[in-house]
């Protein structure tokens, strides 16, 4: 996130806030928050307010340096799990500490029980270390893990169009603000979910140009928890 605008959008998405919510929390106007994003500018005083209110690093807010927040640093795997980047193809032997999981052509081919539709003929795979899968609570043998490309801009800037996501179909417990692959009336999407009283689910897009939706829990099938995503950024 090289711009102040991107970092503010990330903060809004991470905290589950709209621009007016952030403005209210900081005792300023929604137009001021909109100007921060539109003009890609943030005063040090405003950044200090955000830092004190929400715990974000001042250096990160103003300059994009370091980790956004201390609690996000705790999610970084230990060095023993970093490994190295190696070139490989389908003929490369699978190391003992890695597993292959299906890479589907589209989320439409994902099933909530981890199966893959026969129509998905590409046969592509992605490799994960067993340690990584154990760390996120997924099966270390890769069963129940599916990958596919995200489509559309509703989850930007966190998950842009074309990003690769990984879903653990064995983890369907809804935790407010986390990301899930869902199936609603045969429409499969990635969304941020919140539980509400009366057996309701709030379905939120990170891109605040999209309105929140509300649905009955019974009408929303949780395909699985989005535990990983990878973004390729092209040079402008």
From Swiss-Prot:
Gene3D superfamilies: lambda repressor-like DNA-binding domains, Umud Fragment, subunit A. This is Repressor protein CI. Disulfide bonds: none annotated. Residues 19-38 bind DNA. It comes from the Viruses. InterPro entries: Cro/C1-type_HTH, Lambda_DNA-bd_dom_sf, LexA-like, LexA/Signal_pep-like_sf, Peptidase_S24_S26A/B/C, Phage_CI_N. GO terms for biological process: negative regulation of DNA-templated transcription. Keywords: DNA-binding, Early protein, Repressor, Transcription, Transcription regulation. GO terms for molecular function: DNA binding. PANTHER family: HTH-TYPE TRANSCRIPTIONAL REGULATOR PRTR, PTHR40661. Residues 8-61 form the HTH cro/C1-type domain.
